Structure formats: structure tokens, C-alpha cells
Amino acid sequence: MDDYHVNTAFSMGRGNQQDDGNSESNSMHTQPSTMAPATLRMMGKSPQQQQQQNTPLMPPADIKYANNGNSHQAEQKERQVELEGKSRENAPKPNTTSQSRVSSSQGMPKQFHRKSLGDWEFVETVGAGSMGKVKLAKHRYTNEVCAVKIVNRATKAFLHKEQMLPPPKNEQDVLERQKKLEKEISRDKRTIREASLGQILYHPHICRLFEMCTLSNHFYMLFEYVSGGQLLDYIIQHGSIREHQARKFARGIASALIYLHANNIVHRDLKIENIMISDSSEIKIIDFGLSNIYDSRKQLHTFCGSLYFAAPELLKANPYTGPEVDVWSFGVVLFVLVCGKVPFDDENSSVLHEKIKQGKVEYPQHLSIEVISLLSKMLVVDPKRRATLKQVVEHHWMVRGFNGPPPSYLPKRVPLTIEMLDINVLKEMYRLEFIDDVEETRSVLVSIITDPTYVLLSRQYWTLAAKMNAESSDNGNAPNITESFEDPTRAYHPMISIYYLTSEMLDRKHAKIRNQQQRQSHENIEKLSEIPESVKQRDVEVNTTAMKSEPEATLATKDTSVPFTPKNSDGTEPPLHVLIPPRLAMPEQAHTSPTSRKSSDNQRREMEYALSPTPQGNDYQQFRVPSTTGDPSEKAKFGNIFRKLSQRRKKTIEQTSVNSNNSINKPVQKTHSRAVSDFVPGFAKPSYDSNYTMNEPVKTNDSRGGNKGDFPALPADAENMVEKQREKQIEEDIMKLHDINKQNNEVAKGSGREAYAAQKFEGSDDDENHPLPPLNVAKGRKLHPSARAKSVGHARRESLKYMRPPMPSSAYPQQELIDTGFLESSDDNKSDSLGNVTSQTNDSVSVHSVNAHINSPSVEKELTDEEILQEASRAPAGSMPSIDFPRSLFLKGFFSVQTTSSKPLPIVRYKIMFVLRKMNIEFKEVKGGFVCMQRFSSNNVAAKREGTPRSIMPLSHHESIRRQGSNKYSPSSPLTTNSIHQRKTSITETYGDDKHSGTSLENIHQQGDGSEGMTTTEKEPIKFEIHIVKVRIVGLAGVHFKKISGNTWLYKELASSILKELKL
């Protein structure tokens, strides 16, 4: 496979950039046989061009032609491009350098976009930011899913650009370029530090980084995939959340911060955008790009982070220790959770700075006194008076409803001694670039360990440990000795903490290898003993005359009197528990989140045991489901609820049907009413068919242990009966909507959503269709904004009753569905540009024109519900992929009244498209929803800055507090004076050593005032998705937003505006 040339000798920050360029230019003759040969252009320069260079530089950005494997055509194209380049060199040169750049850019070939990384195939882009993009990847053999973060190698890109520039004119120009080069080198160091820290951290609320690959132009980091989305999406759905749910999220964040601070690590960029939610509603902290290692005896001087979540000492450019900055950011995050907005906000950045420095917070009336008490202790301007993390986790609001503070999940550690120092751990620290020299680091560790203070703390540790072990021997709990004195195993020194983390990572890897070896040997023993065991079983059971399969017939020739077990009437043996390995029993390449949708409860129990706050003997192992996990009926018990809520049955049906009578290799039997239900797919049709009925699902064989043969088989003409019943149901729905529209005309405008639902279901005898009585609440107390969600109940169960024509199997071929949480807009293979809307594919339809009728609603005239349903009933199957292929989703507490609707899905689809057109938002309808993009021209941006509040035009999530190393360095995109107040409110520092800087945010702010001549360029567009999902339990249609790229807080306001316009 033709690929980038991989420079295995590359090492960032070791002063060998020049050797790197020479090694790449000569490596085509010394390349290993396992690597694909790189072409001359992929190597950067041809030999003739390389000889003309006076100073060796790194090669330019690698490129590759889309030749579909035809290397001969690629070589011809390269020769042709080289000849064109030579002809341009011989041609007379223009007077201006700009014209030469334009001519050279026109001759540049198309840039290569990678589609895979080893065995991982890129599926789609799920996020983008200033540092790079995140792609979803699927393993081609194991079908595991992971998130691949792709970051440009800043130094390589900078040196490539330098080649295109004229040589420096004077010494000052040389110094300026050298400063820029050092800044790019520090960016690469920051990326490598993020990867190194991510590999050694191991916590259930921290997104795991499994591997990092360094290629010629990019860093590829393989993270576990958290499919639940960002916490920001959760807040958009609700505006704000209830305190008991916010407490659960806050305890997860606090647990992760305890673990980080106990290992001398400070995050420094904690914000809503960097917190993800898994399918089990557990949080995961991501993005350690700005994290650093702190020492409690010293202070940091790097001022970084996002403005809205940055502590006042960062804005004042005061030095800090580290943990207090995370406590402030934690307080802002908690405020956003319970209030739905940031505590400090203003359209003028100068006023916003002053508000943050003053720290005056206004709390909404619906907040409890306890949470206000906690927030008032965290959002304190003076870091010395601010609550510590220990005080936060022990606050009565944080422990309400729980047995105590959140656990830290730190494994059991003991104080180090000289004899315990392992050279292999030091070498691993060197490989991860935490240290520069192994022997020097060992000397530093020895000096720390032999220090009298550390020796005294170690003796106290063992004394108190022995005492508390004796006291806790009755209940078996581990001693908690951190409250009595300073624990030498927690945040004593950063070098010791990194040694602990690296050692624990190696222990986990070694334990995993041992488990794999033991499993393989155990499986081999089982295979060898399989034949005699089966013979013994047949000696005890029934006759062999009922045997039909070949393996049993072969065994029957040895002993004709062997009885046969009556459990499987078709005669097949169930050796699956021996031959098929467990789902998580795979190599180190398994990168699926342990809280993903496919995981079972057994996996979660083992993960909780592995990462329990009480140290266990096997804390360093990576746990997985063993090959024999007990009775398979136990799996069916905890799997039933998930099979009801989603239609993804797949392997679960196979596993549970193996042990049921007359069910092996046979379709699931269904009653006549089951035939029109959407819970079990009929025949070979896809399970995502858009046929919505409210029939109660019948328990199948895979969800019950008994009553296997109670239901009769389907008749031969079942499909025709189903089609007739569907057509009849459609006619009834249309007639019913006639009556509904007549009734709605008589309802007052201010009657509210519940009155509307009551009118729709008036005359029904079912009590659950009537709206619930209003809540009895005292008038002196304001309700939480989401409290009205409890009043709907089952009164709005109408949207799933409308049925679209069935999808023919030929229109969309059936394939294995991978629910990644994102829509199938496979545009990554065509272009990585955010501004390009790709052409029509099999899974999507092109952007709709304004003049279309039902498929693209016109802004001038809005159709009535009756007209929409009539058009939808006549529309061919597959013409509305957003509702023809809906998703079944139910995340606990994820949907509210504002994001759910009782109306039929065609009406929901039409309203979404109508609002998008009305708001001039580009969109593309795909399976399950819409991919949308909001562009901002310079006029729109200027108008928004003048007329919109600060909350609508906030800073981007990547426009963080940054310290400029030089006043002469201008940003890549020039801005107006007002925009510099908003975009350059921070101090970015190169992510290297923390050195004191006299540059403060005020100085940066003054620098922005002097740039009167700058003009505004087009703002980065916002790309997001709108999912149309089926909320099964309550029988409603839901709308779910997911951000892909762009300004985070502007996206939040845009999504909120869309929800208000929808009026679901």
C-alpha cells in the first residue's frame, strides 16, 4: 500500500531537525522491506533540487495522487509535474513575488487525504478545531471503533512554508523567524506531552489514549470513542439540568481532578466543551493539550485556558501553583450545569475581564442554598481564600445522596525505596519523553527518596498503615491515611508521580499479556478435552438416532450406543463458548469505550472493580469478560431492556437463542400483531424501517427463559397482510388528522402544549392518554426551567403512529449498522474543507433548493399539517431519509419538552427544514437527520458584533488565553479592533518551560487597540447535525443536536434559536 514515508528516527525537541531532513532524502535506498517505497515527490525534493539547497530543511508537506493503486500513472504524472516546474524555472520571472506564488500554487498537485491508519479505516470526521480534527475509525477485522485525533506537525509545516519564502533580508528577520520556529517546536512538544500523559493516565472519567503514531506530517492519537457526545449538547437539550443530575456529573469531574492532582498533573483547560458523556451517562474528560506537571513547592507562569473558564489570576498574569486554577474552572462548569449559562458574560471584552476579576456572581432563584454555598466557595477571586479540591468534594451538596466524597480510583501505592527503582520504568519514561536522560533521572529519584523529609513520611506511612490495617481488618477496607499527614505517595514530587504512573501502565500491559497467554493455553486445553467430554455426555443421555449434523455423525461412528441430548432438536452442538473468544478478548488494538452502547453490565462491574477506590490485588490489569461467564440466561436478563430500547439485536439474539428450544438457526417466531411492530425486524428487512405503530411488543424467545412455543408461526401471506394493515393505518391516520385540525382550530392560542395533546386524544378511554394534573407548587418558589418536562407523561404519544411507505430492500442494501452517534455524511474522502458540501451519495441527498415543495419547504408559504402528511404519503420510499431511517435512542434525561414532539415524523421533518431555510442555514438531508452549516460573511459578523449580546458572539473554544512571545507577531487572520478584543483576550505561551512573563492580558488588550488598519475576514462556519430519533418509552419523536466544528458558544445560541423556532 502506497503511503507516507515514515521517519522512524524522528524525535522532537532533541536538536536533530537537520539530520531528519537528510535522513529522509537518503532513506529511499535504506528503507526496510516492510515499508512501501516512497516516490521522489513524497520525499520532498528531487535529487537535483536537493543539491541546489545551501541549508538542509525538512521536506515539504507530503502529497499523493489519487491513482487507485496505479503507480505507473502516478510516476508519469510526477515526471510531467517536474517538467512543468523546470519550464517555469527557465521562463522569465515576474517582478513581484506574489505572482510567482500564485503561479507555483496553480501547478501544485492535489493534496493527499489519508483514508486509513494501519488496520483502522476512517469513517467520518466527528470534530474539528484549531489544533486539528477528530475522525471516527473502525477496525477492519474486529469492527471496534475508536476516535483518532489528527494534529499537524507544526514544525514540519512551518519549515515547509519557509521554503516558499524569500531568504531573510537582515539579522532582525532571521531572529524573527527563529522565534516563530521555536514557537512551532513548542506546539509539537505540547502535542507529544498530551500523548504521553494520555497513555499513562488510567481513570474511568478520563478518556483513554491507547496509542500515538507519528507520521511525516501529522500526529495520530487513538482515543477511546465516547459516543454519547459533548456535555454541551446535553445542556443545549435542556438549557440547564436538575441539581441531582448535575451532582452526578460534578462527582465524576471531581473524581478525575482528585486523580490528576494526586499525580501532580493540572488540566488547565477544564470547560464544558472538554467534557464528554458516554451512553451510560458517565462523564469523560478530554483534551490534555494544555495540561502540565506542577510542583507544590514551585509556581507556574504559563497563562492558558479559555476565557470564560479562566481564573482571575490568569487574567492578571499572576503566577500560580496549579490546582487552584482547576477549582475555579470546575466552579464555572458547575454553574453552567445548574444555570445553563456562564457566570460572567458581556459583549465588551474589557468589561468581561473586569467582571471575572471582580468575581461578582448573580445566582438564579431556582438554585438551592447548598449549591449556592458551594459555588460561592469555588468562585473566589483570591486563590488563597478559594476552596481547595478536598473541601469541594467534602461539601454537603457534593455528598448528598451518597456515602461520602467521590472516589479517586488511585491504585494502592507504597513509598519508594532505592531497591524499588526499575530501570525498565525509567526507559519507558524516556521513550515517552518525560525525561531526557535515564541515569540522570535515576540520580534525581535517589536524592528525593533519600531526603530526610521523604524518609520520615515513609516511616509514618508504614506506622499508620499497620495501625489502620489492624483496625480495618474486620471489614476489609483499605486504610485511608491521607487525612492524618502528608502522603508520600500522592503529589509529593512530580518525578515520583510520573514514575508511579509509568510503572502502573507497564504493570497493566504485562498483566494483559499474561491473561492472553493464560486464556490461549486454557482454550487449547479445552479444545483437546472437548472430544472425550462430549463422548461422556452422550454416554449419559439419549440415543444417537436423532443426530443429524456431520460432527456428531462422525463421533457416532466410534460408539453407536452414545445417547443424544434433547436440548437441541436439530442436532447441532453449541461449542460457541469454546471456539468464539469473548468480545473484549482482543489485542491492544481494542479501543472501544468501556461504557459504550455495546458493553454489557458485566464489563461495567469489572471496570468498577478494577478501578475501585479500595486498592485490589489486580488493580493493574485490564479487565475483560472471560470466555465462560456463567449461564447465558443471566446475559439475557440485563440485556432485555437494551434490546427494547434499541433495535440493534445482532449478536444478542444469537447468544441467547443457542440455549433455547427449537431456536438454533431459525428465525424468531412472531405473532400477527408482532408483524407490524417495529421492535423486531420482519424477515430480512432492515430494522431501521420507518413503520411506526403503538402495538405493545411481545416478549420473544431471547428475552424470556420459558414459553418458547406459545405463539403460532406466521402464515405464508404474512407480508401481504402487513402491507394491507399498513395502508389501512395510513388512511386512518390521515382521517384522524382531519379531526385533529378541526379541533385545534377551536383551541385557544394560549392553551399550551398539554391542552393541545389533550385535544388530540379526547374521547380515548385509556387513562394514560390524558394529561397529568398540574404540579402543586408554592407560589413563592420558582420552578427549575426543566420542571415542566414532568407534565407531559404519556399524553403526547402520537408521533410514532404515522407510517411511511416501506423501504424496498434494493433501494438501500442491508449492511451492518455501526451506530457511531453521528450521521452518515461520508464527505471526508472527498474534501476536508469545512466549507465544501459534497455531492450526492447513496446515503444522502443533495442540498435542497428553495423552490422545492415537500422535500424542501419554501420560506414564503408554510404548508399545513394535513398538506404535509398528504405529500409524505405520496412521496416515494427513500425520498425522506431523515425519517425513513430514524434512530431509536433513549438516554436517561437527555430529552425535554422543547426537544420532543407528539406530531408525526413528516411534520417534524418539514418544520426542521422550514426553520433552516428561514434562518439561511445550509443543510443536507441524510439518513437519520440533517447535516447543517451556518456561514458568516464579514458583514454578518460586523452586524452581529454591533447588535447582538455577548452571549451570542462569544470566543471560540480554541481562542483561549494565550501569551504572545513577540509583539510583532500578527495573527494569521487579521481582525478589526472590536474582534481583537474578543479573539485575542488571552496569553498564549509556548508549551515548553514555564517562565515568568511580564506580558499580561491588559498588555495584549492594548496591543489590539493599535491595529486600526486591519480588516475582518470571513468567520469560521459552524457545522452541526440535527438527528431525528424515536424516543421509544414515551412514544415521541426527538430532535438531537450535535456539534461538528466551529465556535462553541455561537453554536449553542444557534441551536437554541432553532429549537425556539421549531416550537415542537
From Swiss-Prot:
**Enzyme Commission code(s) on record:** 2.7.11.1
Subunit notes for this chain? Answer: Interacts with SEC9 and SRO7.
Gene field: KIN1
CDD domains in UniProt: MARK_C_like, STKc_Kin1_2
Identify the residues that bind ATP.
126-134, 149
**Catalytic function, reaction form:** L-seryl-[protein] + ATP = O-phospho-L-seryl-[protein] + ADP + H(+); L-threonyl-[protein] + ATP = O-phospho-L-threonyl-[protein] + ADP + H(+)
Per UniProt, subcellular location reads as:
Cytoplasm; Cell membrane
- Bias class Basic residues marks the residues at 779-794
One further remark on this entry is: Present with 279 molecules/cell in log phase SD medium.
Any one Pfam family match given in the protein's UniProt record, by short name: KA1
Domain (Protein kinase): residue spans on this chain: 120-398
> Which residues are reported to carry the modification Phosphoserine?
534, 593, 646, 764, 986
Please name the catalytic residues of this protein.
269 (proton acceptor)
Q: Which InterPro entries match?
A: KA1/Ssp2_C, KA1_dom, Kinase-like_dom_sf, Prot_kinase_dom, Protein_kinase_ATP_BS, Ser/Thr_kinase_AS
Which residues lie within the region annotated Disordered?
Answer: 1-113, 549-621, 652-672, 694-714, 762-797, 823-843, 958-1016
Q: What is this protein called?
A: Serine/threonine protein kinase KIN1
Q: Which family does it belong to?
A: Belongs to the protein kinase superfamily. CAMK Ser/Thr protein kinase family. NIM1 subfamily.
- Iron-sulfur found in the keyword field: no
Biological-process GO terms, alphabetical: exocytosis; positive regulation of exocytosis; positive regulation of IRE1-mediated unfolded protein response
Source organism: Saccharomyces cerevisiae (strain ATCC 204508 / S288c)
SMART domains from the UniProt entry: S_TKc
The entry's cellular-component GO terms read: cytoplasm; cytoplasmic side of plasma membrane; plasma membrane
